[in-house]
Amino acid sequence: MPALSLDPMTVTVQAVNEYGISAPVATETLVTPASVTSAPLKSVQLLQLSDFHGQLEPNRSFGAALLASNFAVERLSNDAAFTVSSGDNIGAAPPISSQNAELPTIKAMNGMKFDVSVFGNHEHDRNLAHLRQMIRYSEFQWVASNYNSLRGLDTGTNRAKTFTTVERDGVKVGFIGINTKDTPEQITPGNLDFNYAGKAYSINISDSETRINRAIRDVKAAGADMVVALIHEGWNANTGGEAVGPLIDYAKSLDVDLVYGAHSHQTYSSVHEGTLTAMVSNAGAEYNRTQVCVNTATNTVLGASNEVITTSNAPSNTADADVATMVNDYKSKNQAKLDVKVGQVNIVTPIGGTTPVQRSGEHAFGNWSADVVRAKYGTDFALVNGGGIRSTFPASTYEPADKTLVRDETETGPYDIVLGDVYTIHPFGSVFSVIEVTGTQLWAALENGVSEYPNNGRWPHVSGMKFTADVTKAKGSRIVSITDLSGAAIAKDSKTYTLTLTDFVAKGGDGYNMFDVAKLQVRDLDAEVLIEALRADMAAGKVTEMKLDGRTTVIK
């Protein structure tokens, strides 16, 4: 194979404006050596996806069938082509995947012919027994280099590994995988637990350099010509127009040749310490096409280029027939049920942004859902975590068969809501619960909720109270005031109140570890409660109103 000729790589670093919207800014260039003729050079192509979240249908994205066909076309240009994911393939998914135990997504990934994936935090949305099922059905290799044990992920036939190698056309590429160390806080407690030889264990996920560097040494010892790190971490802020965050830290410190990120759902590519670092946004809206020139005699990467591929510049616009049939078969199982209209809303509530709106301040859907559950259970207050809001409402990623429904914000409302929208915005199957809390615990809960601003999903959407947070202050000291609806201050003391929240939050998810779980009263599935409220409004001839009303004040 001839040497790969590469143009200088122009890469994009995203900055964040005051509204949390990213835009291209300064670039950095990695230049390929002009001429190397004596070494055995090989051209390697990598196709990378991340945070797919079971987006099997082509709603403002590729969809599984079109991704499959494009990946197939891409591979025709290079015999040394590898297809990889940086995690969150499943979990927080539309109903077509979530209502079918996520199996359709694994089947779709098999159809797309993935080689390797790391676990993301959402792979652990359900327990390890479920994840073992996903591994069992996977025709690709899962890797996890920063887990203390992989015994809980051994199916007997397929199993996760700390590293893997894949060889094609005389090039052996090594892969390691790093999941975010914050996973335990972002999932239901107990989802990392397993039994082995009659004893109870729990997977520990860390950013341990010892574990990760051991995997890098091992994959090199296994003969890898180049090493790719699949990392389920992203970037979360910028300083002077340059992205910062865990992904960037890893890229600067790891002794690897290529780094792919994920988790923060933001397009990014740059060069750090000579290492190309790239990630794409979520839900199959785009993928990375990376070309690498590697010297297989010296195991040296001589140059690399990266291009983000969207539906507008993709090589194929024809869907893969087999994957399309599989997706349609699963869709037909649930379509009639999920397309039932349950209400109308006055606005399309937003999601996302470089600083996701649902994770960084007051949100209209968050306000409404907190109000609904507080009223239903008659509690003093309610708290809904922003990370549980997974889509716009109506959901842009769910497409009913009835095209006469008003769905898009470019149309004039009110906007029609079907069951599929509710299961898309709340896909986890959490259970609303009631608990008794003290004023001290309430303050601690809100402090935790604003502690990672503008990152993370723990931002608290509340009902029955108002609060002010000064996010310029140190963590643990950001809540300025909490009042009830009459304006009376909520003191940081032992006075007790009733609070509605999800079982996920009550049991310590997203760092909410201040509650006494023994006092928890489990009630109803989150989606079912919201469906009931929507239907009640529709029966009364009302459009459900969602709005911002100033219950949350953020000092920046």
Language-model-detected regions and their locations in the chain:
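Surface-exposed, short loops/turns at beta-strand junctions within beta-sandwich domains
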Residues: 2-8
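Short coil/turn segments at beta-strand junctions that form active-site/ligand-binding loops
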Residues: 7, 79-81, 225, 379, ...
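Extracellular fibronectin type III
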Residues: 18-35
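Acidic, metal/ion-coordinating pockets
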Residues: 36-316, 360-372, 434, 451-453, ...
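Catalytic centers of hydrolytic enzymes
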Residues: 42-45, 54-57, 73-76, 183-203, ...
